[in-house]
């Protein structure tokens, strides 16, 4: 019965399945394709699962172990990768950070700083070298080194470019004005005072009174001052110099006192050589005056020489009208010749003031000279003190014109010192003292060259050659021509040095006025050949 019962449900199930297939044919289809659709056949899938697990049921206890092993291995691998990555990153950071610091933010600023510093050192060194060169150049100039031995620094802008000469000359002019003005003025004032004292001593040694020597010394200073004003004459100096050779013949007949006044007139010849034809007219009129002076006393002759010298200088820039002015004054000098020493001194010094005003006035200076020649008659009545004060004012007038030529102070001192040499009785002693004074005169010339900066303003040549004339026209004024000829040669060399300094300044008038100075001393001196040699030397040096 139990077997039947056990078989009945199975048969019943089979019957039900069959009925179900017949009733629901899609169910049988789904069951048949259950392997293709396991989601639909839950029972079969569960059965197969259990069958697989039952097959690998021995691996089930190892599943957790496998998970632990896989996790541990993976963790170790990832930790290794992380360590390698972090180590590489740390190494890269350690290496790249110094490289970045060194090469990117430091090297570029360091390079820029190096370039800037190198440029700064280079520029600073060049500026420093230029500054040192300028300082040494200025120190050498102050010490009296010649310009050709003391060239300016090569790095200066005036030495490079087209306008080098103009800029350099402007620099020299400005330095000359700032440097030599007070110095030359002090020297001029001192030499004007000491020149009068030397004139007194020279007058004491001479045959005539000391008063004449004093007036003569003041003449030399006034003529030296005015000789600088006429340094613009140029070639016309030759005519003025030649015209004075005629006076030399007349002066050769005069006595020593007249020779001394002739010496002052030879300074007028130097001014005339610079002034042009007006100097010629002045010299001819003075040759007539020299005849009158030969008859007059020394005081009157000296006063005539002074007035003549200053009158000739008043026409230095005036031209031909100044010649007429000098001739008119030659007539008035006859009236002045009758006056005493005080009157002659006052007239002469007033003439010096007139000469300075005429040199500045140009063509109107001739008229000024003529008009003031009338005033000189009134001034002739003044005392000696007034004329001395006039002399000081005249020297100040010369300094007011020192912008035209600073070297007038130094060279006027030279002419003043040399002008007094001829007053000595003994030619040998006079020659020795002449040598010393000639050296002092050359020193005056050097000071003049410092003041004028070697002819930078064009009037250093007049200073140098006036010193030369001052030395040369004393050769004929002495008794012993041999000794004085030698010393005159040295003085002539100092004059030629003045001419050379003027030629360095680029002023051609210095050379030609020097040659004129040499020519007018040929007839004026006793040693005509010596004078000719000196004159030729002056012309050669000036060229």
UniProtKB/Swiss-Prot annotation:
Loss of function: phenotype: Delayed pollen hydration and impaired competitive ability due to a failure to interact with the stigma. Abnormal anther tapetum development.
Region annotation Disordered: where it falls in the sequence: 148-169, 195-543
Localization terms from the record: Secreted, Extracellular space, Extracellular matrix, Pollen coat; Lipid droplet; Membrane
InterPro entries referenced in this protein's UniProt entry, alphabetically: Oleosin
Sequence repeats: 220-223, 227-230, 234-237, 259-262, 269-272, 276-279, 301-304, 305-308, 312-315, 319-322, 344-347, 348-351, 355-358, 362-365, 387-390, 391-394, 398-401, 405-408, 410-413, 414-417, 438-441, 445-448, 458-461, 464-467, 468-471, 492-495, 499-502, 506-509, 511-514
PTM characteristics: Proteolytically cleaved following anther tapetal breakdown.
Ranges that cross the membrane: 68-88, 98-118, 119-139
Tissue occurrence: Flower specific, especially in anther tapetum, pollen (at protein level) and flowers florets.
Region of interest (29 X 4 AA approximate tandem repeats of G-M-S-G), residue spans: 220-514
Pfam families per UniProt: Oleosin
GO molecular function: lipid binding
Organism domain of life: Eukaryota
Compositionally biased intervals (Low complexity): 220-229, 345-357
Compositional bias of kind Gly residues: 201-212, 230-240, 272-283, 315-326, 358-370, 405-416, 440-470, 495-505, 532-543
Amino acid composition bias (Basic residues), ranges on this chain: 244-256, 285-301, 328-344, 371-387, 471-492, 518-531
Keywords for this protein: Extracellular matrix, Lipid droplet, Membrane, Repeat, Secreted, Transmembrane, Transmembrane helix
GO CC, one annotated term: pollen coat
Main localisation: secreted
Job of this protein: Lipid-binding oleosin pollen coat protein required to mediate pollen recognition by stigma cells and subsequent pollen hydration. Involved in anther tapetum development, especially for the physiology of tapetosomes. Also implicated in the formation of pollen coat.
Name used for this protein in its record: Tapetal oleosin GRP-17
Organism: Arabidopsis thaliana (Mouse-ear cress)
């Amino acid at each position: 019965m139990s077997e039947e019962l056990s078989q009945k449900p199975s048969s019943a199930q089979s019957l039900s399945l069959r009925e179900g297939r017949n009733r629901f044919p899609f169910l049988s289809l789904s069951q048949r394709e259950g392997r293709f659709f396991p989601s639909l056949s839950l029972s079969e899938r569960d059965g197969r699962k259990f069958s697989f697990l039952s097959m690998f049921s021995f691996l089930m206890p190892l599943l957790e172990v496998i998970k632990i092993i896989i996790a541990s291995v993976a963790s170790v691998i990832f930790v290794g990768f992380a360590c390698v990555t972090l180590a590489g990153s740390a190494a890269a950071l350690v290496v790249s950070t110094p490289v970045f610091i060194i090469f990117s933010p430091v090297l570029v600023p360091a390079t820029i700083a190096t370039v800037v510093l190198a440029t700064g050192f280079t520029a600073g060194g060049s500026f420093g070298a230029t500054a040192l060169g300028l300082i040494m150049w200025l120190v050498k100039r102050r010490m009296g080194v010649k310009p050709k031995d003391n060239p300016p620094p090569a790095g200066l802008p005036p030495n490079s470019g087209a306008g080098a000469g103009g800029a350099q000359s402007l620099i020299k002019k400005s330095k000359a004005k700032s440097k030599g003005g007070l110095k030359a003025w002090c020297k001029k004032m001192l030499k004007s005072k000491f020149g009068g004292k030397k004139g007194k001593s020279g007058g004491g040694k001479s045959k005539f009174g000391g008063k004449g020597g004093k007036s003569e010394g003041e003449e030399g200073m006034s003529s030296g001052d005015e000789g600088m004003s006429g340094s613009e004459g140029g070639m016309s100096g030759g005519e003025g110099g030649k015209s004075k050779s005629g006076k030399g013949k007349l002066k050769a007949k005069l006595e020593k006192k007249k020779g001394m006044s002739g010496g002052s007139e030879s300074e007028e010849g130097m001014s005339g050589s610079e002034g042009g034809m007006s100097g010629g007219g002045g010299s001819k009129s003075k040759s007539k005056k020299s005849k009158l002076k030969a008859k007059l006393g020394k005081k009157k002759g000296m006063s005539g020489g002074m007035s003549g010298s200053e009158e000739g200088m008043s026409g230095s820039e005036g031209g031909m009208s100044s010649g007429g002015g000098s001739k008119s004054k030659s007539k008035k000098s006859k009236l002045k010749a009758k006056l005493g020493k005080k009157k002659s001194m006052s007239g002469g010094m007033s003439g010096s003031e007139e000469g300075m005003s005429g040199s500045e006035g140009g063509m109107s200076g001739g008229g000024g000279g003529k008009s003031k020649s009338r005033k000189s008659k009134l001034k002739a009545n003044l005392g000696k003190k007034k004329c001395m004060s006039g002399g000081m004012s005249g020297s100040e007038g010369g300094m007011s014109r020192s912008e035209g030529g600073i070297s007038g102070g130094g060279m006027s001192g030279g002419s003043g010192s040399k002008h007094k040499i001829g007053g000595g009785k003994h030619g040998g002693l006079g020659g020795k003292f002449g040598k010393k004074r000639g050296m002092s005169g050359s020193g005056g010339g050097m000071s003049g060259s410092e003041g004028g900066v070697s002819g930078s303003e064009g009037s250093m040549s007049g200073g140098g050659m006036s010193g030369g004339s001052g030395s040369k026209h004393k050769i004929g004024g002495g008794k012993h021509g041999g000794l004085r000829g030698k010393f005159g040669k040295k003085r002539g060399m100092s004059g030629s040095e003045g001419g050379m300094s003027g030629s360095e300044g680029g002023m051609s008038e210095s050379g030609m006025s020097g040659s004129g100075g040499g020519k007018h001393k040929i007839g004026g001196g006793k040693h005509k050949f010596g004078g000719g040699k000196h004159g030729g030397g002056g012309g050669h040096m000036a060229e």
